């Protein structure tokens, strides 16, 4: 049963929460997101989300949120059952959950005014090199926008991209950023 007198505590810093929000926005807004284009049409409010499946598409999930609500949709059976027996392979790849989530969110937010996610002090937006994952250097041919905690920025990329490899000195100084401290938003 649920207790209504539980003690709460903050699990994430506001900075980490904001970076995760930016990362999960890509699921809906990026052209390679697993739920691309399925954000609710709610006065232009941003959304974030995460798709999920159990082994062999036996359970399908989508969890998403806006500045007002966070909701989850689960599609499955009490006993494990291959969803591709009743849904097409395309539908079984969480699209059914995503579409249900979108329809629900559009209804519950239909009359709500626009609201933005709060920004967080201590988070900065920077270009990063899509080949190395480091902050973009002068010679990086492919860049995207990322969000980082200001106190935990990755090094700047100094790869020799023409050869496709980093020098020994580059490799020694290069560390891929901690995913919990890094937000990624592709152009």
Language-model-detected regions and their locations in the chain:
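Ser/Thr/Gly/Pro-rich low-complexity, disordered linker/stalk segments of secreted
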Residues: 162-187
């Amino acid at each position: 049963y649920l207790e209504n007198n539980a003690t709460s505590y903050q699990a994430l810093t506001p900075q980490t929460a904001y970076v995760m929000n930016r990362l999960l926005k890509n699921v809906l807004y990026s052209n390679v997101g697993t739920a691309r284009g399925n954000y609710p049409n709610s006065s232009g409010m941003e959304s974030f989300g995460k798709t999920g499946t159990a082994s062999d598409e036996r359970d399908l999930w989508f969890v998403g949120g806006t500045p007002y609500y966070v909701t989850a949709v689960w599609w499955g059976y009490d006993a494990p059952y291959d969803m591709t027996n009743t849904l097409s392979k395309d539908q079984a790849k969480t699209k059914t959950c995503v579409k249900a989530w979108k329809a629900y969110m559009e209804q519950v937010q239909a009359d709500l005014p626009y609201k933005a996610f709060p920004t967080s002090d201590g988070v900065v937006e920077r270009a990063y090199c899509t080949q190395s994952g480091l902050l973009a250097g002068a010679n990086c041919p492919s860049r995207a926008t990322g969000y980082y905690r200001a106190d935990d920025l990755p090094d700047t990329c100094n790869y020799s991209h023409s050869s496709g490899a980093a020098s020994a000195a580059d490799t020694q100084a290069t560390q891929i950023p901690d995913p919990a401290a890094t937000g990624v938003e592709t152009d």
